[in-house]
């Protein structure tokens, strides 16, 4: 019986044909992504594109079932595709890259997909994909897990809540989804030091018989087995140094971790196209440590002091190791284990140009790290794949007549809705009318040819937009990426410059606002500039978007007043430029900022709606000096 027989029975022949012709994007091939890839392959999606920036690490293997020890340091996306080939019946296209990289993944690249699955572990990328979904009206299945908690949320642009419709509180825990090959924050280095390095040296079982013929190496290929044994021996070699209690060999650990391994990462050129390269330690730093006194827990010290502390504390733990039956557990209240994690994390931070932290700060962070759970990933991925059939309206017995009839899913603890069952599945809510992403502005995509970008003057561009959407004479135009004022009725300095000369380009987002009306105004529109070299010359195609007249709201609503009193700020600001590496985890501070809504310099113009403005600077930041390419900022 063909594999698809049961699926055809459930969804019908016509829906099965639609499914086979569907093209989906899976962003993330880690914990949830591995499970999702397996699920959507078995569901017979016709074409699946997989994007992931990361490479495989040892810590991934306990829950990311598509990967084996032989795959360590290999790209997740391409390795996952190879791992599923034996049961695959879909066209699979892997990419190793940052989904927020506009040069690799321009907006028109996303247009080919029927649905997007998010399996990400970082907030900036989630927000970015959510905005792409809103600009292109593409359905998005958002998901996430943290330990035993998880959730899944279908997002239908314009019909249901988007990712930004609900506030994202700063998490009190730090989910361990991967151990980064490209750390960008102190937390990444602390996770590496605590969950990988410390466990490998002091808490893992000693090596068994590495030549055991019954050992499952994940392959029958003799060369591959040889390579796996080599990798395994390298890891066990560090532990052998600990077992030997030979303090003179501690510099070998430093050399392996902070010189050899860093050089291996540097050899993977794709990792460093958009980020600063790490700088490994030097032999002289390792071999000439300074003698330092015990430093205070609230001080950081120099990198040389960190190296000396690492050597000293490793020697202490070496002496403890046999006394504790060759197994030491990390405990944040154990001064020795905490000191080891702190020094290792700080050395790694220094190498990756990340600020070092005091032992006191690291104790607070390391004590809150929770592990990822494979079962939670599988449950959330299963719910995501099943709901996609309803999002695409492929179930005849449960047709989707109204998108708010679709369900999201939360674990009981995460949802606070019911403790009587593991999963709660409330129906989707309509968009939050105060959401700055999906409700406060209209959205669209401007298709531009490269020559048009270089020839069209700003004044002509403004006229084109004003006439297309029936805006009055008094308008303002902002570069929403960094809140630069480009044009308004008393600022026309840039009118004779071309779009490229004022640093507008592929991926730029502009905000066009009505500044004239007192009672009724034209709703603001946010436009994404999609520059495509394959478009005909002089192409500047504006989207067919209905921009309605709305009531001017110059005074804060009741909800806004309550929020202001509660939070002490006019608006929760979101960052509009991602970090150089595009890797951000859920412990990012959601900064708050108060924006002065009073007219500036005596102007009688209506102030910019602070909920539309998503960057921590006022709209009247004027570009007066000659523009430079460095001013171009990608969308968060």
UniProtKB/Swiss-Prot annotation:
Q: What is this protein called?
A: Ubiquitin-activating enzyme E1-like
The family database entries (PANTHER family) matched by this protein are listed as: SUMO-ACTIVATING ENZYME SUBUNIT 2 (PTHR10953:SF5), UBIQUITIN-ACTIVATING ENZYME E1 (PTHR10953)
Q: Which organism is it from?
A: Saccharomyces cerevisiae (strain ATCC 204508 / S288c) (Baker's yeast)
Q: What is its main location?
A: nucleus
* Any one biological process term the GO annotation gives: protein sumoylation
PROSITE patterns hit by this protein: UBIQUITIN_ACTIVAT_2
One family from Pfam that matches here is ThiF
Spell out the subcellular localization from the entry.
Nucleus
Organism classification, top ranks? Answer: Eukaryota, Fungi, Dikarya, Ascomycota, Saccharomycotina
**What does the further note read?**
Present with 18800 molecules/cell in log phase SD medium.
């Amino acid at each position: 019986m063909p594999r698809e027989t049961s699926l055809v029975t459930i969804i019908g022949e016509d829906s099965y044909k639609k499914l086979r012709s569907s093209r989906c994007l899976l962003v993330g091939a880690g914990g949830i992504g591995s499970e999702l890839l397996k699920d959507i392959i078995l569901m017979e999606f016709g074409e699946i594109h997989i994007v992931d920036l990361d490479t495989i690490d040892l810590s991934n293997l306990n829950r990311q079932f598509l990967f084996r020890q032989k795959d360590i340091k290999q790209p997740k996306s391409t390795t996952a595709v190879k791992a599923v080939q034996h049961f695959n019946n879909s066209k699979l296209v892997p990419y190793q890259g940052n989904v927020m990289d506009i040069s690799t993944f321009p907006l028109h690249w996303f247009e080919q997909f029927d649905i997007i699955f998010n399996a990400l572990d970082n907030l900036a990328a989630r927000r970015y994909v959510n905005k792409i979904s809103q600009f292109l009206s593409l359905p998005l299945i958002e998901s996430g897990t943290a330990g035993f908690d998880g959730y899944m949320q279908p997002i239908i642009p314009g019909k249901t809540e988007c990712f930004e419709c609900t506030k994202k509180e700063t998490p009190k825990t730090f989910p361990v989804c991967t151990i980064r090959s490209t750390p960008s924050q102190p937390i990444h280095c602390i996770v590496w030091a605590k969950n990988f390095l410390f466990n490998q040296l002091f808490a893992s079982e000693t090596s068994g018989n590495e030549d055991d013929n019954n050992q499952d190496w994940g392959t029958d290929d003799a060369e591959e087995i040889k390579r796996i044994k080599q990798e395994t021996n390298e890891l066990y070699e560090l532990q052998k140094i600990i077992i030997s209690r030979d303090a003179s060999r501690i510099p070998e650990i430093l050399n392996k971790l902070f010189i050899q391994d860093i050089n291996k990462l540097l050899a993977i050129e794709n990792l460093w196209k958009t980020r600063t390269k790490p700088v490994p330690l030097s032999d002289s730093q390792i071999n000439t440590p300074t003698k330092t006194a015990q430093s205070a827990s609230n001080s950081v010290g120099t990198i040389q002091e960190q190296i000396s502390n690492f050597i000293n504390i490793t020697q202490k733990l070496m002496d403890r190791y046999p006394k504790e039956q060759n197994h030491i557990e990390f405990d944040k209240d154990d001064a020795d284990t905490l000191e080891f994690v702190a020094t290792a994390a700080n050395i790694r931070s220094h190498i990756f140009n990340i600020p070092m932290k005091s032992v006191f700060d690291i104790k607070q962070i390391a004590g809150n790290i929770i592990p990822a759970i494979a079962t939670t990933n599988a449950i959330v991925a299963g719910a995501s794949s099943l709901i996609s059939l309803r999002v695409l309206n492929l179930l005849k017995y449960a047709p989707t007549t109204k998108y708010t009839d679709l369900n999201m899913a939360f674990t009981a603890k995460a949802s606070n809705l019911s403790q009587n069952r593991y999963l709660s599945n409330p129906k989707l809510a309509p968009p939050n009318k105060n959401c700055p992403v999906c409700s406060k502005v209209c959205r669209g995509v401007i298709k531009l040819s490269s020559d048009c970008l270089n020839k069209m003057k700003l004044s002509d561009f403004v006229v084109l937009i004003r006439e297309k959407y029936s805006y009055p004479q008094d308008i303002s135009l902002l570069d929403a990426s960094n809140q630069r004022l480009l044009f308004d009725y008393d600022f026309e300095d840039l009118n004779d410059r071309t779009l490229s000369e004022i640093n507008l380009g592929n991926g730029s987002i502009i905000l066009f606002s009505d500044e004239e009306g007192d009672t009724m105004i034209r709703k603001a529109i946010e436009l994404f500039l999609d520059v495509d070299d394959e478009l005909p010359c002089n192409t500047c195609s504006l989207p067919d978007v209905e921009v309605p007249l709305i009531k001017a709201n110059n005074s804060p609503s009741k909800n806004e007043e309550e929020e202001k009193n509660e939070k002490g700020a006019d608006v929760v600001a979101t960052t509009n430029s991602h970090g150089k590496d595009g890797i951000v985890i859920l412990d990012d501070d959601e900064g708050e900022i108060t924006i002065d809504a009073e007219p500036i310099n005596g102007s009688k113009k209506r102030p910019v709606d602070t909920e539309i403005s998503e960057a921590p600077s006022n709209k009247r930041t004027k570009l007066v000096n000659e523009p430079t390419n460095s001013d171009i900022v990608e969308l968060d």
